[in-house]
Amino acid sequence: MSQQNRRVQQNTAAFPLLTAHDILECLAALDIPAQMEDLTKPTAQSTQSIYGSLLEVLMGASINSIEGPKQALLGMMEYKEMYSDTLQFMMFFKHCRRLALLCGIPDFAISDLARPDANRLRKVLSGIMNFAKFRDERMQTQARFQENLQKHQKKAVDLRRKTEELETQFQEITARNAAERPQSEQAQKRNELLKSELLELNSQRLKEVQEYEELKKERQTLLEQVNHNNRIVTQLELQIGSAKSRLVQSPDRIKRHISEMSFAIQSEKAKLASFQQKARELTNRLEVIGALEVDLRGLIDLEHSIQDQRAKTEEAKRSKSALEARLEGRQIESQGLAAKLEQLQRQLQNASHKLARQEETRKGMRERGARRIDELKAEYKVRARERGEWQKQRDDLLAEQKELESEMAAFVTKHENEINEFLHAYWTMRRQAEDYMNTMTVKLGLQVQL
């Protein structure tokens, strides 16, 4: 690309260009050693060292991570010693180009590594520093999301504990109901006996009321007869008094009449006494009937209270059945959620193990890369003296470069697919965790505010 085109793209960059001093400060903040000369008068070695450190800090791709794929590719090629350095350089360029694309620099070329320019290096590093600042800002958001995830996991543990407490309460209620079932059955039998006895008493009450009404009528009749007899006795007494006051010629007739009247009076008095005795008996019977009425009202009230208690018992049974059905549904739902949570935890554990293995592999590759760098530095000093001979082979290498680039593209694509699969598995697991937390929120009536 010409210098003029690069100036045009520099003017239309999507990020601000930093000064060399600002770039040095940013590199120092990332613990990347660099001097002002490395920016104003860059060399291929210093530039590649800066880019390598940036790859390791920002993308976790160190020189060691290149060594393994490089050895795998060299295993499929002939003349390994001839292609080793070139292959490593091309793989390093591929990583740098990917970082540049992420930072909004689409025109990153091999010349930026092999023949670096100060202005060009300043532009690329400005874009990368802008990306690093953006990454630091988003790391806070990611930490906040991680904290929210931990809170949700804690809530899930609390909900699981509450579910276990509900199960314990349900078991206690079931055991208490089982213990109280004999008493309930006895009370129900007693209620049935009381009900049958109450029905008998009610029928007896109806008979007593009917008999009471008949006795009242008979008492009223007897009272009327007593009053009538009293009036007759009074009239007879008046007649006797008037008869005694008169003198008659026939004392025998008067005596006979008097004896008849006395006999009639005695019979009437005896009848009156019998009526009074019967009236007293009727009064006693009425008192007994009144007491029976009071007892009957008490039994009726007892029947009403028993019916109310029975209605409450039926309502309690229905509430208990509804609670048991609801608790059973919650238990089934809790078991499903627990199984889903265990599955997510297993997936997270597998991903953690896979990440740990990759971290160990990356660490080992970094150590091998460091040793390889030392070897390459020593070899570079030797090869610097042999550069003239290598220059003759440059044309042959350029002819084979296309084939090598195709093989490298296939290799990079393969590893990109592995990374994409890992990222896809991570986001799938995260979506499943979010779905699980949303399900817990909806089912248990919680409202989570992030």
Swiss-Prot record:
Coiled-coil stretches: 142-232, 265-414
The protein's name: Probable kinetochore protein NUF2
PANTHER family per UniProt: KINETOCHORE PROTEIN NUF2 (PTHR21650:SF2), MEMBRALIN/KINETOCHORE PROTEIN NUF2 (PTHR21650)
Assembly notes: Component of the NDC80 complex, which consists of at least NDC80, NUF2 and SPC25.
GO process terms (BP): attachment of mitotic spindle microtubules to kinetochore; cell division; kinetochore organization; meiotic chromosome segregation; mitotic spindle organization
GO MF annotation: an example: protein-containing complex binding
Record Pfam families: Nuf2, Nuf2_DHR10-like
Compartments where located: Nucleus; Chromosome, Centromere, Kinetochore
Keyword Transport: no
GO cellular component, one term: nucleus
Gene name of this polypeptide: NUF2
Family: Belongs to the NUF2 family.
Source organism (scientific name): Cryptococcus neoformans var. neoformans serotype D (strain JEC21 / ATCC MYA-565)
Free-text function comment from the UniProt entry: Acts as a component of the essential kinetochore-associated NDC80 complex, which is required for chromosome segregation and spindle checkpoint activity.
Major location (coarse): nucleus
